[in-house]
Amino acid sequence: MTEPKIDRRQLLKLEAAAIAAAAAGMPTVARAANLVTEREATELKWDKAACRFCGTGCSVMVATKDNRVVATHGDIKAEVNRGLNCVKGYFLSKIMYGHDRLTHPMLRKTGGQYDKNGEFTPVSWDEAFDVMALKFKDALKKRGPSGVGMFGSGQWTIWEGYAASKLFKAGFRTNNIDPNARHCMASAVAGMMRTFGIDEPAGCYDDIEATDAFVLWGSNMAEMHPILWTRVTDRRLSAPHVKVAVLSTFEHRSFDLADVGMVFKPQTDLYILNAIANHIISTGRVNKDFVSAHTVFKKGQTDIGYGLRPEHPLQKKATGAAKANDATDISFDEYAKFVSDYTLEKAADMSGVPLNRLQALAELYADPKTKVVSFWTMGFNQHTRGVWCNNLVYNIHLLTGKIAEAGNSPFSLTGQPSACGTAREVGTFSHRLPADMVVTNKEHRTKAEHIWQLPEGTIPDKPGYHAVLQSRMLKDGLLNAYWVQVNNNLQAGPNANEETYPGFRNPDNFIVVSDAYPSVTALAADLILPTAMWVEKEGAYGNAERRTQFWHQLVSAPGEARSDLWQLMEFSKRFKIEDVWPEELIAKKPDVRGKTLFDVLYKNGQVDKFPLDQIEPGYANDESKAFGFYVHKGLFEEYASFGRGHGHDLAPFEAYHKERGLRWPVVDGKETRWRFREGSDPYVKAGTGVQFYGFPDGKARIFALPYEPPAESPDKDYPFWLSTGRVVEHWHSGTMTRRVPELYKAFPEAVCFMHPDDAQEANLRRGDEVKVASRRGFIRARVETRGRDKPPRGLVFVPWFDESKLINKVTLDATDPISLQTDYKKCAVRIERV
């Protein structure tokens, strides 16, 4: 190395460093020494990628050096985050480098042989897949297609979810595949489909800068979507007329910005929503022209139960459970009469929210001069009537015509980076196919079979086991070979003690978990497969505003870790068609005889038609190199053919590597910001102004839906409500964020947030250890009475990121009967001193 020379500019830098270091109490020699280094030693390669965390869809710039991610920063060219990152985003460079990163397949063994009660032992990929294939074939032989299943993720890349759905629905001929988005977004999907006949929001993030009012329903955006919250905050503080209303069952950081803050009793949001609709009607503020031209009215089925096991008393007495999604036609007058019982005065009594605040909230919606954006997340969706909540907030926007235009938008925010792009759009749910198609519709199945080049009748016509039902079927021994990818359901799933863990350890079952780290779920499995993360593979995510984003592989995965996509496709080689399809199906397409599932599904002349030389020069692509063709482009273009031409259009593959994402539908190279509005959405017919084209009549549905009580409420034995959720420092189960030292130290363990008066009454002090116990289980946690979250009396809040405090041992596995999404926000507990 040549002797470093210091010029005048560098000398000034050194002097400045010395002054700054002295002020901070830092040793100046070490600080200054880092400023003079050869250029070659500091050169970094920068590239764009979508953030690995929430559904906001921030773009980040990623720096790599020596095959390692060494830095990240917010992408200043990105429309979504405009150069900003949240606290988690700032530490993205560290998520892949935890000390316990998995690098080899691990199989439970005793004496060199697989043993469900054995110790995890490193094995080769060949041995791992050989044992796994044997167990899947045994399950198929024993129970047919219903004996195998998969639990996937809203963190799958688009092509991973597509390949997985294809493998199970077409290859194994089972719809027993579901994403963990069932726990977070299923009610939003069902709400959109019921109201509009098509999924995903009408608006986009640009609404933030155009609106006059924000209403947050069960959404702590300040912590869960902090980058969007910065945009909301900027709009509120820079435009004095703008108002912010926040509704929640406890006070949180989003209340700091609220002009109208409302803490309501759990489940009474249903009552408040109907009361607002009644206020709009009774004060004469219905947009009659809009309602007449663009809506019809429906009365929904009532008494629909709580998605519990059929033998549960609540299910037995639910008269409408078997037809939960049904609805009948009614008139506007009948709807108006229905909601007339829901007055703001009654809503105040029911909810505990002061009447003047409910009136202020209702006026934001009713005033025709006020543009309104409604945001919601898990407070609505993780709800035994979550679909109804979605429908009811759409009612309000439709009654006033405040929809599908800049600043007027009902908007469900997503929690995972590709809950929209992969779970919803690809259709990895147990009842869905790509582009809003469903397995119960013969025309949809026929189209999928045509695109996938399958014989008629390949795809089953009944929905498979959804997330909660998968756990029940595993426990009952009816689902015997099970593959989990990119989620931690033993920590995340409800009622884990009684319904989830027993199925994992059922001796009749073989459980495979693909993960980058030894999560709670991985450690309960029989086989662990080490997985490539984030920029260790080429990827694509779709965010909450319909924005699809791509990134290149930037570094290699450690050891023998492989991507979920590689695992899915490589595993498919272990099955001949004769292993999985009946003879009568094979006879319809004799040319598949003797071929593997890999040949039929992925080497089918479509997925494999793009050669390796189409990969952009300068980037690695481990999966494509392994299979001999550009896998990602082939899968994407085949998948995109489902949606092009009917409102789900995606741009050509290459466009996404050039852009910071595009919002679909993308027609003739132009993205769509506001759907259903003439002049913005290319699918709206000229002269209609607004067209909700998800339904043949072009009209949205306004639903009459009542208040119904929760599945479980506090009583003398369990006197507190329990609500669970997240904190800004950690993401979901903490598998990644708890391995980042700075984030771990910032919030090292979950606590039980409690009202000070409740604590005092129980003779508890801040920091005391307590049991949080329900009828299903308990955890131990320390009491927090002065934290950021401030529950009202009678409610406690416990985050679920901490694997040492598995709060989902306590929660109830009740679901919305329509969406089958779990309610993590309402169950009854008691608090006991340890």
From Swiss-Prot:
PROSITE patterns: 4FE4S_MOW_BIS_MGD, MOLYBDOPTERIN_PROK_1, TAT. Catalytic subunit of the periplasmic nitrate reductase complex NapAB. Receives electrons from NapB and catalyzes the reduction of nitrate to nitrite. Gene3D superfamilies: 2.40.40.20, 3.30.200.210, 3.40.50.740, Dimethylsulfoxide Reductase, domain 2 (3.40.228.10). It comes from Bradyrhizobium sp. (strain ORS 278). It catalyses: 2 Fe(II)-[cytochrome] + nitrate + 2 H(+) = 2 Fe(III)-[cytochrome] + nitrite + H2O. This is Periplasmic nitrate reductase. One of its GO terms (biological process) is cellular respiration. Keywords: 4Fe-4S, Electron transport, Iron, Iron-sulfur, Metal-binding, Molybdenum, Nitrate assimilation, Oxidoreductase, Periplasm, Signal, Transport. Its cofactor is [4Fe-4S] cluster; Mo-bis(molybdopterin guanine dinucleotide). It comes from the Bacteria. Mo-bis(molybdopterin guanine dinucleotide) binds at residues 88, 155, 180, 184, 217-224, 248-252, 267-269, 378, 382, 488, 514-515, 537, 564, 724-733, 808, 825. Residues 1-32 form the signal peptide. GO terms for molecular function: 4 iron, 4 sulfur cluster binding; electron transfer activity; iron ion binding; molybdenum ion binding; molybdopterin cofactor binding; nitrate reductase (cytochrome) activity.
